[in-house]
Amino acid sequence: MIKRSVKFFSLLTFLFLNQFLQSKENNIYCFIGDAGEVNPTQSLVVDALTNSECSIVWHLGDITQLGVKSINDTELQESFLNPFKPFLDTNVPFYLTVGNHDHKGNPKVYMEVAKQYPSIHHPNNFYTKRFGDLCFFVLDTTIFDKLYYFHKRGSQIRWLKDKVKEYKDDCEFSIAVAHHPLFSSGDRDRANPQLAIFLERHIFGTFDIYITGHNHVLADEGDHKKTRQLISATGALPGGSPIETEPGKFNVELPGYLKIIVEGNSARYEFIGAEKREILWSNIKIGNGLR
């Protein structure tokens, strides 16, 4: 009887550990940005994602170069849906963020796209997504970058404050996802004053990691107010790395993507080159949830 109990317990332990390990293996988040122009680089990055171990992918904005005005806009098919078809066919969940080029059209079109493509997620231009105690906040930073969108800012700020307060005790690790960075070690300038004020007040010092596109590089810019800024924006038009990278930072203009694995309050991340599928840079961030 004791032997049977031991065997049964061992079987349960094996099944539990096996499921635990599988969940950890599947907990791989990847990030690309600025992949809206049809060219060989875009194809290279899409192919790398299609054949990657990513279980969830986030697009960091500038989904197309010209923006799309409706669900029937040819730009949508030609610059996004057709080039990304090999990846979309994998049914890997694909979460969208909108950038400044998407605002050249109507970025809410992607809400309609998400209804037609089960693997695409875009419930709004700003939203949250939780995976257990890992919390993602997706933001629309273009409305802070462009003065003529000032009337749209209040609703997002109020929403953000409410959600941070609501989730504060539930998030062991927090990631904010948006299009525009606050600063850069490359040739892009710091965010303009109105955008910088928003990011300084509401993002840096609140989240563990802030992941963006816009600057067409792969970059680990280090911490500011204990928030790590990462950039993954070489989906189609790499360019803008410094001649010499500052010590402790990483900044290259190679096609690729960012890969993150989060366990508890620890995130291990790697920048992957699309051409050779090699690790270009890796690092670790210990988080504090939402502050």
Residue ranges and their predicted role:
Residues 34, 61-62, 99-100, 139, ...:
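Active-site glycine-centered loops adjacent to acidic/histidine catalytic or metal-binding residues
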Residues 20-75, 184-185:
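N-terminal active-site segment of His-dependent metallophosphoesterases
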Residues 11-21:
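Hydrophobic h-region of N-terminal signal peptides that target proteins for export
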Residues 29-31, 57-59, 96, 176, ...:
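Residue-level marker for buried hydrophobic side chains located in beta-strands
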Residues 249-291:
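A short C-terminal boundary segment appended to hydrolase-like catalytic domains
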Residues 167, 180-182:
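C-terminal structured domain segments across diverse proteins
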Residues 69-174, 189-209, 215-263, 267:
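Extended active-site neighborhood of metal-dependent phosphoesterases/phosphodiesterases
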Residues 1-9:
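Bacterial N-terminal signal peptides that target proteins for export
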